[in-house]
């Protein structure tokens, strides 16, 4: 029993460690991208109600293949539109503004920006089971613009 609990604890800990580092501060992300010569990846999500958003998080964002690529190439920004949890007013205002600015019509939406905030490409939706390799390939195609 102890070994089973230890194994489960290791699995949960390793999944948490694989989670890429995301910020919610758009302006700080642009500044960081400029300083580090990276792109910005915006994830427009409904974290507590959007099933495909949850699958994208579980099947892609927690996987080593995505994390390794993202850490080298992007500053990651979560732009969340939850229904159950309350966001601080300034974050809600920022997210609403970004949703309007980028004309978000569905969730999840991934948008790649250069460090000046110019859109290089977007993916709307997530194909369950496609995994990190498909998402990374799509993101790489935006980097060539």
Where on the chain are the PLM-derived regions?
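Short pre-active-site segment immediately N-terminal to redox-active cysteine/selenocysteine motifs
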Residues: 37, 45-49, 106
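A short beta-strand-turn-helix
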Residues: 22-40, 70
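Sec-dependent N-terminal signal peptides
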Residues: 4-14
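Hydrophobic beta-strand anchors of alpha/beta hydrolase catalytic cores
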Residues: 41-42, 50, 76, 110
